[in-house]
A protein has these predicted regions:
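Domain-level signature for soluble enzymes in the chorismate/prephenate branch of the shikimate pathway
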Residues: 2-337
Length: 337
């Protein structure tokens, strides 16, 4: 019988060779402060160059117009610019309002070099009407503060200023009676409008517990009446002609405070004791730009019509039928007085 050979099976204990490690060299993406500063300097140089080029082109455009003075206030062109900014600024990080602010100053400076526009507004400086005027005309315009809404109309009517800015309606308090009254007295026209979000602040130079008097214009006090009743019941409320006048008083009278804007706190060196005290967080005021001439249509306009009708039954209904017949929608109707 044949013998079977024994076969010993051994398990290999040798270690397999691993692939050689590759050394990866990563370049740092962090730039030195000096490199960043150098890049910023290049950008600043280019921005200044482009801003001046835009200003020069605006001057050239206005001067080439058959009516240069009229071209300086062109709502249609301004509307097109607003639409372009929203389209070009889709990626940010600047907000559309911030970019519009840059262009506003460019256009305002260009117009000033041709003819400084004079604009009357309900003052003093940094009232809400002043802020609305700056929003529309920029800092290149000559701003003329006056003490009353009626005085704004008079300045424009006498030719002392080309335009005026007045409040016409508030989302909380409704119509501004003084403005509507002046439209019945003087033959001026609405040339444009400015919408301003109104955020009231309690301003003072003393501690909150030391406030005994609060000043502001009637509309501002009305828009904060609930907050003031809850939080400042011990303080006496006083009506003045504007929020800026209130800020001036708060800056000079012991124990006095004002309901006014953030900008007023800076202008009159006041502390913001409480921010945003308006009862309605969506508090918006519509300001009218008034002048003597009718502006060209932009395609997205509002039209204001002042009519006087007979004091007879059905006269108002007959007037409204004209709008219905011509398929014109009405968004605001006021009976005055």
């Amino acid at each position: 019988m044949a013998k079977k050979k024994a076969v010993n099976k051994r398990t290999s204990t040798s270690t397999p060779k691993l692939p050689a490690k590759k050394t990866v060299v990563r370049k740092s993406t962090k730039r030195s402060p000096a490199a960043v500063q150098s890049e910023l300097k290049k950008l600043d140089r280019e921005i200044v160059k482009l801003v001046n080029k835009r200003c020069a082109m605006t001057i050239k455009q206005i001067k080439s117009d058959p009516e240069p003075r009229k071209a300086m206030f062109d709502p249609k062109s301004d509307e097109e610019l607003r639409e372009n900014i929203e389209k070009f600024n889709a990626s940010g990080p600047l907000t559309n309002n911030a970019v519009r602010g840059v262009f506003r100053q460019i256009l305002s400076s260009a117009r000033r070099q041709i003819h400084p526009q004079r604009v009357a507004y309900l003052g003093p400086a940094y009232s809400y009407t002043h802020l609305a005027a700056l929003e529309r005309f920029g800092e290149g315009a000559d701003m003329v503060p006056v003490n009353t809404i009626g005085a704004v109309f008079e300045e424009v009517n006498r030719g002392n200023t080309e335009f005026g800015v007045v409040p016409i309606e508030n989302s909380t308090d409704g119509r501004v009676v003084d403005t509507l009254d002046m439209f019945t007295r003087l033959p001026l026209r609405i040339c444009g409008e400015v919408l301003i979000a109104i955020h009231h602040n309690l301003l003072a130079r003393c501690e909150r517990s030391q406030i005994t008097e609060i000043y502001s214009k009637p509309q501002a006090l009305s828009q904060c009446r609930e907050w003031l009743a809850r939080n400042m019941p011990q303080a006496h409320l006083h009506e003045v002609t504007s929020t800026s006048t209130a800020a001036q008083l708060a800056a000079t009278k012991p124990g006095a405070a004002a309901v006014a804007s953030h900008q007023a706190s800076v202008e009159y060196d006041l502390q913001i004791i409480v921010e945003g005290i308006e009862d309605n967080a969506n508090n918006v005021t519509r300001f009218a730009v008034i002048g003597e001439e009718v502006c060209d249509p932009t395609g997205s306009d509002r039209t204001a019509i002042l009519v006087q009708i007979a004091h007879t039954a059905g006269s108002l209904a007959d007037t409204l039928q004209i709008f219905k017949k011509n398929k014109v929608n009405l968004t605001w109707i006021e009976s005055f007085p």
